[in-house]
Structures are given as C-alpha cells and as structure tokens.
Regions:
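Catalytic, metal-anchored helix/loop core of enzyme active sites in primary metabolism
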Residues: 1-378
Length: 378
C-alpha cells in the first residue's frame, strides 16, 4: 500500500536525503516545507507534486507563491502553515526533519491528527519527551526514530521479544576534537568545528557533535523513547561510526546494529517499517573495516555531556532549558559572537539561573525555551 508522506524540512540535510530515497519506496509526497530555501523547494515541488508546501519565512512564501503560480499546489507560511502540512495534508507519516524547537508544535499536531512520526527532530523529545510520548500512546501513533543511533537501538530492541533491556550503549563519533583537552579547544574556529570526520550534516548538529551536546541530547531522547533511566544509558565513543548503537539484555548479551555512516538507511527504514526494501547505499565489508575502537568519553573536556545528564535526571523543564540555551549559544558561535567553549558555559548559566519546574505543560516548555534563549542572548 502506498504511503502518503509529509516532509517537514525537505530542503535540509535529512530532508534532501529523504527525497533521495523516495524512488526506492512506494510513497506519495503530500507536503514539503522549508524555512527560506525556496529555489530548492520549488524544484522538489515540481518533481514530487505535493498537495501543499510551506515556507516559514513570510517573504520567502510570497516569492514561492509566484514561482508555483502555474501549479495547483497550495503555498502556506509560518508556524500555522507548518502545522497544516503536518496535520492536514492527508499524510500517513510525517518526517520531522526541521532543526530545533520549531519542530515541537507540528509534531504534536501530527500526533493528535493520528499521523505516525519519522522523528529526525530530536529537540522535540529533549524538550517535551513526556508530553510527546504520552500523546503518541493516547492517539495510537508510532514514533519511528530516524537518528542513526536511535534507529539502531530500535532495531536491536526488536530482538528482545518483549523482554526488558538492561542498558543502552549509545555510540558517539567523538567529533572533530576527540582527544583534545578543554584548554586546546578554547580558540577553535567555526571551520574547525564544522569539519566532522564521518558524517555529512547541517551546521547546527555538526557543532553539537563537536561539543558532544548532540550525544547528550540523544541520551535524553533515548530515555523517553525507550523508557529507561539515564543511568542505564552509557555513552561510548566509537571513532569509526560503524556500530551505530547497541543494547544489553538481562543475561549480559549485547546486540548491536552495524553499517556504513549513511543516513539514507535509517531514513528509509523509518518510512518502510516493518518491511525492509533494497536501499541504494554502499554495502559494508567487515574485512575492509578491519578494526573497531571504543573509548570512554572525556567528561571534563566535553562538559555538555554532564549538563545533559543532569537535565535528564531532573526531567521537568530542564530539557527545554538545555536545548533552548544550546540552540541560542550555537547560533552565537556560528555567527562569530562567542568562542567554542563558551557554548557549554552559556548553557550551564541558563540551567543555573532559570528556576526548575518539575510538572510541565506544553506552555511551560515554550516558556522555558524562551527564557533560556533570552538569558543566553542577553
């Protein structure tokens, strides 16, 4: 049966790779969105013929409407447009490939409309994991992870046959600054931080990989997806990015998922699950890989990890504060306003300054995010 797919953030890194794998699966695209990359969105829209498209930026949407005037594609804008593409486009499954907190409201709207979620926007679970997972259960929808690590864990968990898992082994590449001490990283430039050794990703997530905040965010995401306390999620640095993560069971057995670092495979699996279909990605040869290495992370050199672990242990609004502060600080770094090691320092200051709230609503999440950004940008 052909699936109807909405791709939120279709012009970004995950979005374009989602478009790349569409010929391999039986799918119809019903909605596409961008922030302001309307030339690429026009190209995608003319090729895929969606029912609706959205440019978050209002001026970009006006220009896009002119570009697509000869089609019957509805052009929307703003958060209302993004939510409409998620919830009102007729999609069976929504790929949430937008970056940052902007993904939360459309994801919740899609869940409440009964759409399955192919989740690439980790911030949604980091900020409001309890609310999102509760809503998914209430509305009977599946959250299918697109992150390579969480896709790996998802696949390993299938081997549990209903038995509980003891521990998640969450692998991390270590980023471009693996092995360096914090003093060595103080003067690191934007270009150095964006030089990831294994993965091709957007700028924000690449900086998060360099600070290792990305792995901290993924720890919180795993906590909510797999209902495990943070102390049962172990971060392991694995430089080759071949073992995408692993799960340990009660008897001590460990099952891992391996593959070359290519996001198209977990994207495709999220869209075809529980079926597997051929994927046009390079096949792995263990003989050519030859060696796999594993290390404990350096928590002193990468303080973002401890900040994330502390936020995970407290839950409540701490995930929203952590994420909002980090997004703002990464933006400052990318624009040359602060240094590399200032990112974690700004996040720590926000966590220390904003009063903790344990029992939260969606409005509390949005308020915590806003407060964190204001403090960092202050």
């Amino acid at each position: 049966m052909m699936k109807k797919i909405a791709i939120l953030g279709s012009t970004g890194s995950i979005g374009t790779q989602t478009v790349d794998i569409l010929p391999s699966i039986d799918a119809e695209v019903v909605a596409l969105t961008t922030n302001r990359r309307i030339n690429l969105l026009e190209e995608q829209a003319r090729a895929l013929h969606p029912k609706m498209v959205c440019a978050m930026d209002e001026n970009a949407a006006k220009a896009l409407k002119i570009k697509l005037a000869d089609t019957d594609i509805e052009v929307l804008t703003g958060m209302d447009g993004l939510i409409a593409c998620a919830a009102e486009s007729g999609a069976d499954i929504v790929v949430t490939a937008v970056v940052g907190m902007v993904g939360l409201l459309p994801t919740m709207a899609a869940i409440k409309a009964g759409k399955d979620i192919a989740l690439a926007n980790k911030e949604t679970l980091v900020c409001a994991g309890g609310l999102v997972m509760s809503a998914a259960k209430q509305y009977g929808v599946r959250i299918l992870p697109v992150d390579s690590e969480h896709s790996a864990i998802f696949q390993c968990v299938q081997a549990a046959n209903g038995n509980p898992i003891d521990k998640i082994l969450l692998t991390a590449s270590g980023g471009p600054f693996f092995g360096k001490k914090i003093e060595e990283m103080r003067g690191m430039t934007r270009e150095q931080a964006l030089a990831h050794p294994n993965w091709s990703m957007g700028a924000k997530i690449t900086i998060d990989s360099a600070t290792m905040m990305n792995k901290g965010l993924e720890l919180i995401e795993a906590m909510w997806l797999y209902d495990l306390p943070p102390e049962d999620i172990e971060i392991v640095v694995h430089r080759e990015s071949i073992v995408h993560s692993a799960v340990e069971f009660a008897d001590g057995a460990v099952i891992a998922q391996l593959g070359l670092p290519d996001m198209r495979l977990p994207i495709q699996l999220a869209l075809t699950w529980p079926q597997r279909v051929p994927c046009k990605v390079p096949r792995m040869s263990l003989a050519e890989v030859a060696k796999l290495t594993f290390y404990a992370p350096d928590y002193e050199a990468f303080p973002a990890l401890n900040l994330a672990k502390h936020a995970a242990s407290l839950k409540g609004d701490r995930g929203a504060v952590l994420n909002g502060a980090n997004e703002a600080a990464v933006g400052l770094f990318l624009n040359g306003k602060i240094g590399f090691t200032d990112i974690a320092e700004r996040v720590a200051y926000a966590l220390d300054t904003i009063p903790y709230k344990k029992d939260i609503t969606l409005d509390d999440v949005l308020a915590a995010d806003k407060a964190a950004r204001e403090i960092v940008l202050g």
